[in-house]
Amino acid sequence: MDAKRSVDSAGNLDIDFTVIPKYRVSQVAFSGNNNFSGARLQKEIDTYAGSPLSEVGVKRDADKIKAYYQKKGYSLAKVSHSIERNEEDGSGAVIFEIDEGGDIEIQNIIFKGDPRVEKQYGFWGKIGRFLFGEDSKDFDSVDLLSEMKTDTWIPIISHLTDNGRFKEDEFQADIEKLRKFYRDHGYLDVEIDDSKIKFEFPDTDSPGDMDIVIDIVPNHQYKVGKVSFKGNTIKGFSDEELMKFVDYFNLTEGNVFSPSQVDKLIDQIREYYGQYGYVDTIVRVLRRPNVKTGDIDIVIEVIESKMFYLESINIQGNSKTKSEVIIRELALEPGEVFDLHRMKISENRLKETRFFDEVTLSPEETNIPQRKNLKIAVKEGRTGNLTFGAGFSTVESLVATVEITQGNFDYSNYKSYFQGAGQKFRIRGTIGLKSNQVIISFEEPWVFNRELAYGIDLYRTDSDYYSDYYSEMRLGVTNFLRKRIYERIEARLAYKLELVDIYNVDREIRGNVIPESDIGTRTISQVSLSFLRDTRDSYMVPTRGTRLELIQDVAGGPLLGQTNLYRIEARAGWWVPTFDFGKQVFSLVGRTGAVQGYGGKEVPYFERFFLGGGYNMRGFKYRKVGKLDPTTEEPLGGNTFAFASAEYSVELFNPVRFAVFYDIGFVNSDSWDWDPSDYCSDFGVGFRVLLMGAPMRIDLGFPLKAGDHNDDGMQFNFSFGTVF
């Protein structure tokens, strides 16, 4: 804006204002962006066509684009900008000129200054180190690399995982992780000087290949000196009682001083007090360096509070989920002692519902002495999903999936779009080269306001992958009740009514493999009772915990139907972490079962047990463990089976794990025949990769003990499924 003054002939003062409109952006263009589209880069900036033109804003956006490239591993990227103004219409075109510079691939990460970590391991050297390395209390370069997200480039694999590219923000976070690692091993004065970190490009023919050299000076290792307590006067909180926690976290005299273990100790003692209602108890650790010994003496000071009781429950943020759905998950009730331990259990239960993005439980002050409210703050999450998926396996071939789920369903509340009651609803359809499936499921987790779940499943499956000689269709409905009967043990009572159709049966297997009575349609009316205890830390990739399940089925007889059988099956799994480096995990999985017909009826072919393939005996073809028909080599199955598998896996780098395994099992024709003389066994190696939230498994299995009929040499098993 410009202003001019003038005086007319009459002596009046005239002021003229000239308004110059601010330039507006006519278009935003990108040049040189070979690896990322303009639409993708536009999401990173604030300048857009039609917005006011700001040179400061454009410069800021150029920096944002450069930061985005660096985040994606293009650390040599350069971004400049230019503005082409049009004086006539007051517009300007913004052009971002990008020199991507190629991505930097990390060839080696080298540690200097600490002799223990200077030895380097290649890709296969890491595997050997993980599997056959000595169990030492000290650490080496593999342990440091396990702490870092930054990793070396591995052909093919790095293209899938995006590991091996240099990303500045990740690397800076990794340096802090290394400092923390050393401090937690007692090296409180460790020096990792950013100015001494070197980025070397030794190969002139490959300018994007880089070595990282990190200089580490550990300095003195501190150990725990004398441990004492102060202020713990309440009965039941003696020095001897609290010393149990000190011992648990390895902070007794002579052990390495670890700041993170000290923090855990503080939290544990505070929670121990809070478990008995002493909610406001303050716990702090005083560190006193001992000049004479070079150790750190610890004084655990406790400022004890009064005992508090729970007054009321205050829920905030549940705009969609009913309050009663939240309250029924709580392990605390008004009038009880305010137990911090049970408060944490309640918080975990609410998180496990997956109804909320954020869940926070905390004590809240009241104006009543020794009374506190329980404040529950939640942030509603997205519980409905429409997912499309694709999968492939050596058994089922290619499969496409579409699924609609609502994890917080409410069939009676259309005003909130059928959400908020904590019910489960799912519709799933799959179509593939060898199988098709449709399933509709509903579950009410609290029937009559009791912790008793009711559910119903309607389904239809068509399968051709069981055999090349026949096809199978199942159409059915299952109703079930499920209840937690003790801590993590739950019982499930189910009734299933199913129609099974065996069709397209090849003439070669009629009668000798599949009895004529089993061909065509048959109904199954079955009651099942099962017990399950599951303590795994993850359903997708478990690293610790157990899973125990017992299943009993009875079909026919007074339940009617055309199938009379009794079946019992037991399943067990155990996962245990062994060493921290590489996040190594050992697992044992076993299954066994038997089925028998009654009332003069045999067990139908489609209800027998089978073993073999990528889901159990990985060194054998699908279903080829047990007796085969001598003419067609079609598996006959059996009425008794047992199977066990041992697997040891180690993380090479996130998200790739390497595994070695051993499988053993048998299938016997008769019911209740656990004679293992005809067992088969195999061993092998494999990889586990978590991509886009779904596991990919690649296994090579080699038969160890096999019969003449099923020794087909090495077996390749592959499976992968995801949603997008």
Where are these regions (language model features)?
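Flexible, surface-exposed loop regions and adjacent strand-edge segments
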Residues: 34, 230-233, 316-319, 471-476, ...
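Short beta-strands and strand-coil junctions in structured, solvent-facing domains, enriched
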Residues: 25, 76, 85-86, 104, ...
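A short, conserved beta-to-alpha structural element at the edge of catalytic cores
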Residues: 146, 683-701
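A glycine-rich phosphate-binding loop feature that marks nucleotide/adenosyl-phosphate handling sites
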Residues: 200, 286-293, 366-368, 494-500, ...
